[in-house]
From Swiss-Prot:
E.C. number: 2.7.7.27
Disulfide bond entries: none
HAMAP family, alphabetized: GlgC (MF_00624)
Name of this protein: Glucose-1-phosphate adenylyltransferase
Xref: SUPFAM superfamilies: Nucleotide-diphospho-sugar transferases (SSF53448), Trimeric LpxA-like enzymes (SSF51161)
Length: 431
């Protein structure tokens, strides 16, 4: 009798590669000095912590993180927060920066090329049987081992994670059609007119940017792709169509491996690639029963929280509304200020008479007296002067700050320096 394969049999043969080199240009100044996966999220985590935590919780302890753009803060975060795996047991989180292996002027030319340039290390050092490719810039909880098991049981050589999205949103994703066995029959990357799902005219089946490959098949397709004159060096544009043509591409619906559904049974996956989506995903966490439960200890999201004293709240003015429906990280000092429906990261000082509403405040911000901040994202190290009002007058805000399509105001220290006519100081990337 042949042995029944379980997901626990497969994780040791799998190498995870997290693609974390992207800038996230739609986040504008928020990613000027940090890669998108290194961006703060949820009060005391970074975006990449979700992919990394999913790996550890799934039993996947052989992880390579591919970096390129503005990688310093990301590398420091990985070194200080994710170096606990015992290498003597073959477990690791290795960093794979762009090393210009093609020539001295060639950085990673795309997602597929970032793996191709590390292929010698992958083949000769890690020697995996399966390779799991992840984007490092999405917010979700997922048991990857279930996807790997489905990949093996289906006989696929490549499996792509998929999720149902509104058709009008599908232009930003790869979109596919599948048969009753989840074999992919059509795939198009970022279509201008996304095809609808059968029987669901307002929905499309979108790629999550998560792939499982048989390692040998991935090596073969990367070699074929890099030698093609029409290549974009991209998984969605090149590798997926190739696997489709080879008839070895299958889909894995996210609802088969999603961890931590909400009380309505809904699954949660977010691409926080715009100012609006980043703001909304943070603000969602302050609700009584958020779709994403960051307090769930059955599937914990690890990170590298700052060592800080407990936050301090001082109120001797009974007229102050104080704090409600908000997340406040450690090291904050709140004095006679009203804070509602907001996320404050570590070591933020808010002075008396100030009102903060529906705002995301990144670490080490100082807010002066009698300020108003509404529907803002305030970047790290910003110092808001006394009496400043942001998010109140859109016309005035537009003169100095960036305003998103939905009216969210992004505030950076450089913007404030320009507003005050000061010399713009160079910023380090020790984020």
């Amino acid at each position: 009798m042949s042995k029944v394969i379980t997901k626990y049999d497969l994780v040791g043969d799998t190498l995870v590669l997290i693609l974390a080199g992207g800038r996230g240009s739609r986040l504008h100044e928020l990613t000027d000095k940090r890669a998108k996966p290194a961006l703060y999220f949820g009060g005391n985590r970074r975006i990449i912590d979700f992919a990394l935590s999913n790996c550890i919780n799934s039993g996947l302890n052989r992880i390579g993180v591919i970096t390129q753009y503005a990688a310093h803060s990301l590398l420091r975060h990985l070194q200080t927060g994710w170096s606990f795996l015992p290498q003597e047991r073959g477990e690791f989180v290795d960093m794979l920066p762009a090393r210009q292996q093609i020539d001295d002027n060639t950085w990673y030319r795309g997602t597929a090329d970032s793996v191709y340039q590390n292929m010698a290390i992958i083949k000769n050092h890690y020697k995996p049987k399966y390779i799991l490719i992840l984007a490092g810039d999405h917010i979700y909880k997922m048991d990857y081992s279930q996807m790997i098991l489905d990949h093996v049981n289906s006989g696929a050589k490549c499996t792509v994670g998929c999720i149902e999205v509104p058709r009008e949103s599908a232009k930003e994703f790869g979109v596919m059609a599948v048969n009753e066995n989840l074999k992919v029959k059509a795939f198009v990357e970022k279509p201008s007119d996304p095809p609808a799902m059968i029987g669901k005219p307002n929905s499309s089946l979108a790629s999550m940017g998560i792939y499982v490959f048989n390692a040998e098949y991935l090596y073969e397709t990367l070699e074929r792709t890099v030698n093609s004159p029409q290549t974009s060096h991209d998984f969605g544009k090149d590798i997926m169509p190739m696997a489709l043509e080879d008839e070895v591409l299958y889909a894995h619906p996210f609802d088969r491996s999603c961890m931590g559904r909400n009380t309505e049974g809904e699954i949660y996956w977010r691409d926080v690639g715009t100012l609006d989506s980043y703001w909304q995903s943070n603000i969602d966490l302050v609700s009584k029963e958020p779709q994403l439960d960051i307090y769930d200890q059955t599937w914990p999201i690890r990170g590298n929280p700052v060592q800080a004293y407990p936050s301090k709240f001082f109120y001797d003015d009974p007229a102050c509304k104080q704090v409600d429906n908000s997340l406040i990280a450690g090291g904050c000092v709140i004095t006679n200020a009203s804070i509602s429906y907001s996320v404050l990261f570590d070591n933020i000082h808010v002075n008396e008479g100030t009102l903060i509403d529906e705002s995301v405040i990144l670490p080490q911000v100082k807010v002066g007296k009698n300020c108003i901040l509404k529907r803002c994202i305030v970047d790290r190290h910003v110092q808001i002067p006394d009496g400043m009002q942001i998010g109140v007058d859109p016309e005035e805000d537009s003169k100095h700050f960036r305003i998103s399509s939905k009216g969210i105001v992004l505030v950076t220290e450089k913007m404030l320096q320009k507003m005050k006519g000061e010399t713009v100081k160079s910023e380090d990337d020790l984020d």
